[in-house]
């Protein structure tokens, strides 16, 4: 599957670079709406009370406690732009994949998972071929060393300081589906890579 996603994306972008393309107006409208939603959300001061979210689970407990206690409000001045980059990369990825003929079965959907007496919410990125995939923007170093030829699932698992694996399995469990892995765009070069999760996932699902 990873080769199919990458093959279709690379083939489409290569064709566009040589010949151009007439995009589906519906996809252009969806992209515009996603960008607008990101700008409004990131600039808004109405972020509500802290609640545990799938995107924060798997990270160090001390960091989660700081966020709960309000430390997340002390963002550095460039944080907003960094968050917007992530949102826009997701919107670009979805536009390109749909235009390349990849069947996206679900996208940017709110999900909730019951964990004991508590529930945790989140927003999954995409479902493709019956699996949940996470879209990431990455620095050149992370692109190569974490998700690319020099990295991979096993290397991410060895030092998963951001909780990517736990988050992926929580999203997938909320949909009762397997976790596909990560679709990653190098934010410096625009290159793509698909980093797949293993087919046998039961052990990692339990750990998540």
Language model regions located:
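Metal-dependent nuclease catalytic cores that hydrolyze phosphodiester bonds in DNA/RNA
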Residues: 1-132, 137-155
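Alpha-helix initiation and capping sites
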Residues: 87, 162-165, 206
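Conserved alpha C helix of the protein kinase catalytic core
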Residues: 89, 167-170
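Amphipathic coiled-coil/heptad-repeat helices and related helical stalk/stem segments
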Residues: 119, 164-167
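Metal-dependent nuclease catalytic regions and adjoining charged, substrate-binding loops involved
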Residues: 145, 158-160, 170-208
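A short acidic, glycine-rich active-site loop
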Residues: 151-165
């Amino acid at each position: 599957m990873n080769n199919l996603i990458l093959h279709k994306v690379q083939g489409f972008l290569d064709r566009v670079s040589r010949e151009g393309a007439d995009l589906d107006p519906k996809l252009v409208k969806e992209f515009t709406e996603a960008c607008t939603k990101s700008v409004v959300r990131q600039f808004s001061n109405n972020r509500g009370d802290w609640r545990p979210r799938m995107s924060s689970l798997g990270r160090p407990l001390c960091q989660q406690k700081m966020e709960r206690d309000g430390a997340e409000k002390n963002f550095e001045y460039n944080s907003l732009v960094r968050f917007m980059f992530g949102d826009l990369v997701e919107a670009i990825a979805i536009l390109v994949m749909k235009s390349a003929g990849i069947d996206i079965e679900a996208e940017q959907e709110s999900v909730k998972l019951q964990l004991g007496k508590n529930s945790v919410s989140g927003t999954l990125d995409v479902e493709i071929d019956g699996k949940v995939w996470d879209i990431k923007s990455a620095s050149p170093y992370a692109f190569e060393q974490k998700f690319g030829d020099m990295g991979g699932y096993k290397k991410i698992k060895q030092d998963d300081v951001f909780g990517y694996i736990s988050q992926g399995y929580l999203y997938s469990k909320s949909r009762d589906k397997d976790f596909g892995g990560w679709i990653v765009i190098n934010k410096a070069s625009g290159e793509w890579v698909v980093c797949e999760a293993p087919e046998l996932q039961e052990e990692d699902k339990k750990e998540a």
